[in-house]
């Protein structure tokens, strides 16, 4: 930058965009002090300084995370088969995460469990000890920036726990939950051959009277990639078919929420409102899925909620290195879990919807 250009910028400093001013400071062409001397608005100067403070903190966090990843020893993941699992606990709300292979189900669970643990909300339930071990491994590895292994082709995991509700209105009450994660291969098998003991319905996991929350996982990156690369049956077609099968199977009569989760939302265009973009993305690209969901809502007289979430676990580098954890996505999910599941009374006997 020559002296004339620098002078021109300093004379018009208050009419320039914040991002441009940050870039000038970052490049070393102009300092914040020089801008202030030439009349820069104090509020804008503070914004520039805050930007660099946050950037410095982010880099320190990334360096710490990368160091922890390098020194972490990955443990084998305890994936189970249907025959290894105990029956679901009755009187709990069942949460099912359904989506094709690689859609991000395990990463979502790791993110949610990490957030719950950070907030001190988890009350252990060892009805399925292997599920508790799996949950703890997800949380521990996530805290080190290690992403979960893909669920084994026949893999299922069932994690029972209770959440402490610290809302002053509900102080002392708990939300008993069964988290159920099934491999994408079992989901595909249900799409191809129906819901049965060889796909996602073994051991009466879907055929029970527990209230249910269903999470339909859409992979944003995979959808965008499919615009130019043939990838077989679309996510939407699979989810629509499995949703119809769940209706036929009788599962939806006990369902209180269907949540369409758009994963990898960190790949959305920069600067967009994530919630609005996710909603419009689904409305524009998954019209059939939305139509089917709304028809089922009408069939069951609006008994269940229909909500679209954007979801990102954070800043992922080199495909599998999590260097910055995003707290906002799990916060949204947990908020609705507390609102749409039921909870015990203080005596722990009668169940109430929250």
Where are these regions (language model features)?
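N-terminal pre-Walker A segment at the start of P-loop NTPase domains
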Residues: 57-86
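Hydrophobic anchor at the beta1->P-loop junction of P-loop NTPases
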Residues: 95-97
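P-loop (Walker A) phosphate-binding loop of NTP-binding proteins
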Residues: 100, 111
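Conserved glycine(s) of the Walker
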Residues: 103-104
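Hydrophobic positions on the alpha1 helix immediately C-terminal to the Walker A/P-loop
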Residues: 108
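Flexible phosphate/Mg2+-sensing switch loops adjacent to catalytic phosphate-binding sites
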Residues: 114-153
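Switch II of P-loop NTPase G domains
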Residues: 156-162, 169-211, 223-225
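Conserved GTP-binding G-domain of TRAFAC-class P-loop NTPases and closely related GTPase folds
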Residues: 201-206, 210-354
């Amino acid at each position: 930058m020559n002296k004339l250009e620098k002078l021109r910028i300093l004379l018009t400093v208050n009419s320039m965009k914040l991002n441009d001013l940050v870039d000038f400071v970052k490049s070393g062409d102009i300092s914040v002090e020089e801008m202030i001397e030439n009349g820069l608005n104090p509020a804008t100067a503070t914004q520039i300084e805050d930007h660099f403070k946050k950037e410095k903190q982010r880099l320190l966090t990334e360096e710490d995370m990368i160091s922890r990843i390098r020194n972490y020893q990955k443990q084998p993941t305890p994936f189970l088969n249907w025959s290894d699992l105990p029956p679901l606990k009755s009187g709990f709300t069942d949460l099912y995460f359904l989506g094709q292979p690689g859609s991000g189900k395990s990463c979502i669970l790791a993110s949610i469990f990490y957030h719950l643990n950070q907030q001190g909300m988890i009350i252990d339930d060892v009805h399925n000890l292997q599920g508790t071990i799996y949950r703890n491994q997800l949380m521990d590895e996530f805290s080190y920036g290690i992403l979960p292994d893909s669920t084994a082709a026949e893999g299922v995991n069932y994690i029972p726990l209770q959440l402490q509700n610290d809302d002053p209105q509900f102080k002392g009450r708990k939300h008993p939950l069964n988290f159920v994660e099934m491999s994408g291969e079992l989901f595909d098998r249900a799409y191809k051959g129906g819901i049965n003991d060889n796909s996602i319905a073994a051991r009466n996991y879907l055929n029970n009277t527990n209230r249910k929350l269903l999470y339909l996982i859409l992979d944003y990156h995979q959808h965008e990639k499919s615009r130019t690369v043939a990838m077989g049956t679309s996510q939407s077609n699979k989810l629509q078919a499995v949703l119809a099968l769940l209706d036929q199977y009788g599962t939806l009569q006990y369902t209180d929420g269907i949540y369409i989760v758009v994963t990898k939302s960190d790949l959305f265009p920069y600067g967009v409102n994530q919630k609005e973009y996710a909603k419009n993305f689904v409305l524009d690209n998954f019209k059939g899925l939305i139509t089917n969901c709304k028809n089922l809502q009408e069939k069951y007289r609006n008994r269940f909620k229909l909500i679209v979430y954007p979801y990102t676990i954070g800043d992922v580098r080199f495909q599998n290195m999590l260097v910055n954890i995003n707290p906002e996505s799990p916060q949204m999910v947990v908020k609705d879990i507390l609102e749409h599941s039921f909870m015990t009374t203080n005596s722990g006997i009668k169940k109430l919807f929250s």
